[in-house]
């Protein structure tokens, strides 16, 4: 059996402005993932710089910070078997032009800078915990029993 885990996902300002929150949430629910936290918010400069800190020395850092602070986002925590890998697969490639149809970025992404969604990197050990703690207090995460989980997981 695969690992049951939590993962961080964020609908970026372009996805919020285009009214895509509901569709994105539905896709993850349809996949059998369970939302345990959700927050509609405006990211400030300090949080943006901390969130993208790994890219601080890169030429695109200022653009990332400017974009993610340009409008509201919808931050979420999803739970399920291999949740991070499932979410990353459903999101598609970072560049929408390289994303398959049927993925979130393949269907809705416009370009590399406007790719609708962010998800924790499954190859970065600790990325989930770091991002979840950055955006959510423990009290904002809800442990609940999904009634159909016995149908989803062995």
Swiss-Prot record:
Return the EC number: 2.7.4.6
Q: Which reaction does it catalyse?
A: a 2'-deoxyribonucleoside 5'-diphosphate + ATP = a 2'-deoxyribonucleoside 5'-triphosphate + ADP; a ribonucleoside 5'-diphosphate + ATP = a ribonucleoside 5'-triphosphate + ADP
Q: Which cofactor does it need?
A: Mg(2+)
Annotated GO molecular function terms are: ATP binding; metal ion binding; nucleoside diphosphate kinase activity
- Keyword Transcription regulation present in the record's keywords: the answer is no
Instruction: Tell me which residues this entry annotates as catalytic.
Output: 118
Q: Which residues bind ATP?
A: 12, 60, 88, 94, 105, 115
- This one is known as Nucleoside diphosphate kinase
| A cellular component annotation (GO) from this entry | cytoplasm
What broad class describes the main subcellular location of this protein? cytoplasm
Role according to the record: Major role in the synthesis of nucleoside triphosphates other than ATP. The ATP gamma phosphate is transferred to the NDP beta phosphate via a ping-pong mechanism, using a phosphorylated active-site intermediate.
Q: What is this enzyme's class at the first EC digit?
A: transferase
Where in the cell?
Cytoplasm
Report the family membership: Belongs to the NDK family.
What InterPro entries does the annotation carry?
A: NDK-like_dom, NDK-like_dom_sf, Nucleoside_diP_kinase
Q: Which of UniProt's keywords are assigned here?
A: ATP-binding, Cytoplasm, Kinase, Magnesium, Metal-binding, Nucleotide metabolism, Nucleotide-binding, Phosphoprotein, Transferase
| One Gene Ontology biological process | UTP biosynthetic process
């Amino acid at each position: 059996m695969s690992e049951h885990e939590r993962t961080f996902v964020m609908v970026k300002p372009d996805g919020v402005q285009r009214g895509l929150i509901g569709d994105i949430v539905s896709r993850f629910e349809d996949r059998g993932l369970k939302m345990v936290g959700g927050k509609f918010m405006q990211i400030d400069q300090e949080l943006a710089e901390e969130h993208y800190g790994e890219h601080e020395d890169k030429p695109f850092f200022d653009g990332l910070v400017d974009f993610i602070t340009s409008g509201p986002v919808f931050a979420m925590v999803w739970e399920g078997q291999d949740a991070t890998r499932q979410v990353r697969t459903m999101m598609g490639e970072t560049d929408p032009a390289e994303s398959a149809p049927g993925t979130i970025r393949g269907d809705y992404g416009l370009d590399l800078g406007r790719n609708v969604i962010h998800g924790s990197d499954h190859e970065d050990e600790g990325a989930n915990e770091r991002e979840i703690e950055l955006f959510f207090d423990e009290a904002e995460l809800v442990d609940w029993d999904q009634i159909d989980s016995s149908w989803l997981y062995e």
